[in-house]
Swiss-Prot record:
It comes from the Eukaryota. It comes from Glandirana rugosa. This is LIM/homeobox protein Lhx9. Residues 326-379 have a biased composition (Polar residues). Isoform 1 and isoform 3 are expressed in ovary, testis, brain and heart. Isoform 4 and isoform 5 are expressed in brain. Residues 232-257, 310-379 are annotated as: Disordered.
Length: 379
């Protein structure tokens, strides 16, 4: 440093002032470090009070030291207790129960988010797969059946936090007879995956949103034939659901009480094919729905035809079942008010005997319907 035009006394005074300011700056100099996300300024050492290192327990005589968790550390002593990584150059460190951890080891041991497959911790910087409320490692997001890794755009199903590919999930729900297949579609957003439910429409295409109910032919339900060997107190119905054609459906069984079965059999002896108004009154009388009654009468007609053919082919075999009585013709006495009143008394009698003769002409009684007087008197 050159001084021109200044006397020696002034130069000596300037040098002393610069030295004094340099010592003052050294005393105020400190090093900062973030502890658990907070920045902490390291105060300078005071020569009056010796400071002990929290790591090795020795006296700190260095010019600079580290302050973490309200304790002083040598630069070389602040290390992760797991991997022994020196933290003097790290921006953050974490403390738990008096131990110091680096960021990776802290998240690995004490992370709140855990993989739903391997149950290990997930680092905050790690890319994950999300499905519903569960989080998975990329390597753990695989099909439970075949262990194939699922990627963005693949369809999958979930059951009890277990992931299945679409084909395997279909086989799974076929065994459980689920009413709907709830798949999940992957879409990459924000490093994770969002779950979108969809439904199959039976043609291999994907139908988004709420599935439409298909219109069933005839009565709106698939009728299961009423065989002669089945229980007469039960009727089988197919669930009216949007199943794919190849998927097996579960039958819903309806049990009839004695008075319900007695009433339907007695009316079947009068008319094999009741209309909508008759079914409504039958439903009010028996407590059954019109849909169940429709299926019962259709099954009873099918059983009647089979027994009739068996009787004709077998040469006079005895016709079984109380529902095999043919309805009387429209001009018979059964449709008069007197005959209807007699039928009503038979309905309320516990010892009902329906033993009417079988009329082989089936076309005439299926197209006809009993008169209003007969149905009113019947109930």
């Amino acid at each position: 440093m050159l001084f021109h035009g200044i006397t020696g006394g002034h130069i000596q005074g300037i040098m002393e002032e610069m030295e004094r300011r340099s010592k003052s700056a050294d005393n105020r100099l400190a090093k900062t470090i973030q502890v658990n996300g907070r920045e902490t300024r390291m105060p300078p050492l005071s020569p009056e009070k010796p400071t002990l290192c929290a790591g090795c327990g020795g006296k700190i005589s260095d010019r600079y030291y580290l302050l973490a968790v309200d304790k002083q550390w040598h630069l070389r002593c602040l290390k992760c207790c797991e991997c022994k990584l020196a933290l003097e150059s790290e921006l953050t460190c974490f403390a738990k129960d008096g131990s110091i951890y680096c960021k990776e080891d802290y998240y690995r041991r004490f992370s709140v988010q855990r993989c739903a497959r391997c149950h290990l911790g997930i680092s905050a910087s790690e890319i994950v797969m999300r499905a519903r409320e569960s989080v998975y490692h990329l390597s753990c997001f695989t099909c439970t059946t075949c262990n194939k890794t699922l990627s963005t755009g693949d369809h999958f199903g979930m059951k009890e936090n277990l992931v299945y590919r679409r084909a395997h999930f279909e086989l799974l729900v076929q065994g459980d007879f689920h009413s709907q297949l709830n798949y999940t579609e992957l879409s990459a957003k924000g490093g994770g995956l969002s779950a979108l439910p969809y439904f199959t429409n039976g043609t291999g295409a994907v139908q988004k949103g709420r599935p439409r109910k298909r219109k069933s032919p005839a009565l709106g339900v698939d009728i299961i034939n009423y065989t002669s060997g089945c229980n007469e107190n039960d009727t089988d119905l197919d669930r009216d659901q949007s199943y794919p054609p190849s998927q097996k459906t579960k039958r819903m069984r309806t049990s009839f009480k004695h008075h319900q079965l007695r009433t339907t059999k007695s009316y079947f002896a009068i008319n094999h094919n009741p209309d909508a108004k008759d079914l409504k009154q039958l439903a009010q009388k028996t407590g059954l729905t019109k849909r169940v009654l429709q299926v019962w009468f259709q099954n009873a007609r099918a059983k009647f035809r089979r027994n009739l053919l068996r009787q004709e082919n077998g040469g006079g075999d005895k016709v079984e079942g109380p529902s095999l009585s043919a309805p009387a013709s429209t001009d018979s006495a059964a449709l008069t008010p007197t005959g209807a009143a007699s039928t009503l008394s038979d309905l309320t009698s516990p010892s009902l005997n329906v033993g009417a003769s079988v009329t082989p002409n089936m076309d005439s009684h299926e197209s006809g319907s009993p008169s209003q007087t007969t149905l009113t008197n019947l109930f």
